[in-house]
Amino acid sequence: MSLESVRYSRGSLQVLNQLLLPHKSEYEPVTGVQQGADAIRTMKVRGAPAIAIVGVLSLAVELTSRTCQDVPSFIAFVQESLCHLVDARPTAVNMKKAADELNAFLAKEAEKAGATTQGLAESVIQWAEALLKKDVEDNQMIGDFGAKHILETAGPTEKVCMLTHCNTGSLATAGYGTALGVVRSLHVLGRLSHVFCTETRPYNQGSRLTAYELVYEKIPATLITDSMASAAIRDRKVTAVVVGADRVVANGDTANKIGTYQLAITARYHGIPFYVAAPSTSCDLSLPTGGSIVIEERPSHELTDINGVRIAAPGIGVWNPAFDVTPHELITGIITERGVFKPEELRDGLTKGQ
């Protein structure tokens, strides 16, 4: 059984407080939008897909008990709530896309004859619940497409060795995972020899979360520091690198956890493929290049302190961007629930048939 970042039933939402992992597994109730935004902002929940899921479900939970006088006030409340959730962590595009789609859906529902606040609330709740279900299905497709694509260049029975960064598994999504979903699918097929996961400083999502998931799933894995990646690729014969994404723009430039860019550079130097695994909800075709992506900067104490203990000299300056942007030229392929695309194929691949 996979780990769960969220536990949801109608009117009830609990999130696994990932700040406490791996030492303690504790689910905390989220009773409304404010708690949802706080959980996102403080990184109790993280990962672009999971942020969107928790955001819309926190709204759904609040709507089960909230009453509004009329339809206009209901719409205003939903719009304000979604803005608040988007602002909690702006780099990850999934929450913004979910907010835009939900606002458009709500506007159409409100135009229907006889629309009531109660009926609209039910529609929004059902929309959020459908998003939860679809995320798991999409992640399984990503895993299957990615594994199949990577194995196309391997021998009929050859096993592959992977390297991944940050946390992109069940803890970063509604379930199964994106980049870690690809690793999981390779393992299920019996074609994974090993996976290396980086610790992912300064927030240590790799050592705290990915290592936790890999041990839980009994997947053969080794934890390395971020600075060991190049040596691991060369000396441990890594087949390919696969990472997740917080935002992929139209030309394929990708914003992901800080440290991703350098992995793409070393993968290119060593002549191995570098893949981005992300659902279409993480793809923002409205931005032409990665230069337009807003990069979140985190507090300095996340770099200077560990568990409340300062490890850096007082007075030192700190630059702590949460993400970097990998140029599309360094990306071999983008693995989505609709297939695997070269960066230059992404727009057509995602818009075909729409």
From Swiss-Prot:
Leader peptide range in chain numbering: none
EC class: isomerase
Pathway(s): Amino-acid biosynthesis; L-methionine biosynthesis via salvage pathway; L-methionine from S-methyl-5-thio-alpha-D-ribose 1-phosphate: step 1/6
Catalytic residues (UniProt): 246 (proton donor)
Keyword tRNA processing: no
Keywords: Amino-acid biosynthesis, Cytoplasm, Isomerase, Methionine biosynthesis, Nucleus
Catalysed reactions, semicolon-separated: 5-(methylsulfanyl)-alpha-D-ribose 1-phosphate = 5-(methylsulfanyl)-D-ribulose 1-phosphate
Annotated site (Transition state stabilizer): 166
Keyword Ion transport: no
Any one of the GO BP annotations: L-methionine salvage from methylthioadenosine
Cellular compartment(s): Cytoplasm; Nucleus
Family: Belongs to the eIF-2B alpha/beta/delta subunits family. MtnA subfamily.
UniProt xrefs under NCBIfam families: eIF-2B_rel, PRK05720.1, salvage_mtnA
Identification of the protein by name: Methylthioribose-1-phosphate isomerase
Gene name of the record: mri1
